[in-house]
């Protein structure tokens, strides 16, 4: 039987600080045994002068700081934050269906960036990085936008869409960078960092 390439993590209880079902699935797909945890009162604000492409890493670091005093020496915690940046505007999760439609109209026919900030921390060490993926959206009709927003779950996703859902199949004409980053965790980069612990 072959050894898991991430067996170096066996000395830790790995914690994923996220409620995202996509992040949980992606980390499991990477072969990591972990437990999900989530604090409900983490301040995810950021200074107004933060460059749009740095917002996700700033928020991921704030999440790591919120957990830093709570982890023990045998624990490793992963935090992440994903945003969509279009025309210099940061798009988080939509407030409601109307907001989701507004976001998708903004993305329609344009190239945007999906940025995920990630931290991996133990009691004595923190590694932080961000991944950026360029995503090209085809021109979407109002009917396509309404179909997606009323039949799928855009409200729990940055930029109001999931690349793995119908809109990704029908509306995304190209990507440059990590596909998994668009889903919420840049797995290759995360694997490389986890291998170093």
Please describe what each predicted stretch is.
Residues 32-33, 43, 110, 151:
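A short linear boundary/processing microfeature
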Residues 34-47, 126-132:
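Short glycine-rich, Thr/Ser-proximal phosphate-binding strand/loop in the N-terminal lobe
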Residues 2-15, 51-197:
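Anionic-ligand binding patches
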Residues 21, 41, 187:
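Short, glycine/serine-rich, charged loops/turns that create anion-binding
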Residues 13-38, 196-197:
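N-terminal G-site helix/loop of the GST-like fold
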């Amino acid at each position: 039987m072959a050894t898991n390439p991430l067996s170096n993590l066996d000395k830790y209880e790995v914690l994923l600080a996220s409620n995202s079902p996509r992040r949980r699935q992606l980390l499991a797909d990477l072969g990591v045994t972990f437990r999900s945890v989530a604090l409900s009162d983490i301040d995810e604000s950021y200074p107004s002068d933060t460059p749009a492409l740095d917002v996700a890493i700033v928020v991921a670091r704030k999440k790591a700081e919120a957990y830093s005093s709570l982890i023990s020496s045998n624990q490793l915690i992963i935090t992440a934050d994903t945003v969509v940046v279009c025309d210099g505007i940061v798009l988080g999760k939509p407030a409601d269906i109307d907001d989701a439609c507004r976001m998708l109209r903004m993305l329609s026919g344009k190239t945007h960036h999906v940025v995920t900030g990630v931290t991996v921390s133990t009691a004595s060490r923190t590694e932080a990085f961000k991944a950026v993926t360029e995503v090209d959206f085809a021109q979407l009709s109002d009917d396509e936008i309404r179909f997606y927003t009323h039949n799928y779950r855009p409200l729990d996703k940055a930029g109001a869409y999931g690349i793995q859902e119908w809109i990704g199949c029908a509306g995304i004409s190209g990507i440059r960078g990590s596909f998994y980053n668009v889903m919420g965790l840049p797995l290759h980069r995360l694997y490389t960092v986890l291998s170093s612990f």
